Amino acid sequence: MAEIKDEGSAKGYAFPLRNPNVTLNERNFAAFTHRSAAAHPWHDLEIGPEAPTVFNCVVEISKGGKVKYELDKNSGLIKVDRVLYSSIVYPHNYGFIPRTICEDSDPMDVLVLMQEPVLTGSFLRARAIGLMPMIDQGEKDDKIIAVCADDPEFRHYRDIKELPPHRLAEIRRFFEDYKKNENKKVDVEAFLPAQAAIDAIKDSMDLYAAYIKAGLQR
C-alpha cells in the first residue's frame, strides 16, 4: 500500500497503488456506470400516490422561455431541441409526467400554471384541471393543463372552466402560433374538463405499465 499524507492534518491516508497501464473492459465499465448513473426522470421518478389527479411532473421549459428543451429518452438528460422561430415565449412551465407514455411513444405533456418560472430539470406536484386536444402536423399531441399543487395562488383551481377566459385564449394562441414560422400546422380543439385530463393520464399510466411489462418479457 502506498501512503499519501494529507498536508492539512497529521492524519495519513492509505490507498492501493494502481498500475497506470491497466484499462477497464466493457464489463467493468458497465458495472461502474450502472452504480454511479443518475436517476432517469421518466422511469425512476414516481408519479405520486394521488395520481392521476395530483401527480409529479418534470419541467423541461421554464415559463417565459424561447428554448425548446426536451427529454432525451435514452440518456435521461434534458437536451436543446431548438429555439422557437418566433418572438413568442412559453406562457407557463411545460414538461412531462413520469411513468406515462402516449401514442407517440413519449411521456404525457403537461403545461403547469403557477406564479414563477421553474428551473429546467426540476420536478413539482401538479393538479390536472383540463385537457387541450391538439393535432400537430396531423398527429395527436394532447396536452394536460394543470396548476401547481403547492402554489397558493393557483392550487385552489379544480377545473379549467374556473380560469379567466383570457388565460385560456393565451394558451390556445401560443400553441396555434409557435410553429407557424417553421411552416408547421398545429390545430387546437376545444378545451376539455378536469375529468378528461384525469382519464387521459390514467390511460397513459396503463400504457406505460404495459410498455414496461413488454420490455421485461423480451
Curated annotation (Swiss-Prot):
Protein localization: Cytoplasm
GO biological process terms, semicolon-separated: cell wall pectin metabolic process; cell wall thickening; phosphate-containing compound metabolic process
SUPFAM superfamilies assigned to the protein according to its UniProt record, in alphabetical order: Inorganic pyrophosphatase
EC code(s) of this entry: 3.6.1.1
Entries under PROSITE patterns matching the protein: PPASE
Keywords tagged on the record: Cytoplasm, Hydrolase, Magnesium, Metal-binding
Active site: Y90 (proton donor)
Catalysis: reaction(s): diphosphate + H2O = 2 phosphate + H(+)
Name the UniProt record assigns to this protein: Soluble inorganic pyrophosphatase 2
